[in-house]
């Protein structure tokens, strides 16, 4: 399953606020579609599926990528759900979004893919790169790159800079000073339901 490229507000009406997907808030509170306002009891499977979809759409990843992250999270010590969120938060495109370099995760990914971002002084165009403590993430020293980031920093998206990252706005550079903690995740999500969703699938 590839990344979603359709109307973003349609997704937020169904799943709630997704800071990584869009800056805009849905005007209608009920889900899209002809029967969107109908009230019906959701099954446990539907609830788990919804939480899984929140992760996919917020971080802009495909189903195949998410399955890989779930497997990685399971292989690590500690809570699988917390490990999963940390893996997604540490992606380079998400870090750039949290810093305000991009208005959304897809916008930040575009900056990375087009060579506007450096890690430890070298241009890195791999959006899935796992940022770690000690890494310095910055906007490339190039007029076009700086201009793009300046516009985004002036009107930042819905995420904020988490405590484990120190941002120097003037230099458009940030240093990751520690590991990401669960409470610093901007998305409202029940990661345990995501783990349960994949418990029999992966």
Curated annotation (Swiss-Prot):
Basic residues compositional bias, start-end: 1-13
Pfam families: Ribosomal_S4, S4
Keyword terms of this UniProt record: Ribonucleoprotein, Ribosomal protein, RNA-binding, rRNA-binding
Family affiliation: Belongs to the universal ribosomal protein uS4 family.
A GO MF term: structural constituent of ribosome
UniProt superkingdom: Bacteria
Region entry Disordered, spans: 1-43
Occurrences of domain S4 RNA-binding (ranges): 90-152
Source organism per UniProt: Prochlorococcus marinus (strain MIT 9313)
Regions annotated as coiled coil: none
Role summary: One of the primary rRNA binding proteins, it binds directly to 16S rRNA where it nucleates assembly of the body of the 30S subunit. With S5 and S12 plays an important role in translational accuracy.
UniProt protein name: Small ribosomal subunit protein uS4
Entry's Gene Ontology BP terms: ribosomal small subunit biogenesis; translation
GO CC annotations on file: small ribosomal subunit
Signal sequence extent: none
HAMAP family: Ribosomal_uS4_B (MF_01306_B)
Keyword Glycosyltransferase on entry: no
Subunit structure: Part of the 30S ribosomal subunit. Contacts protein S5. The interaction surface between S4 and S5 is involved in control of translational fidelity.
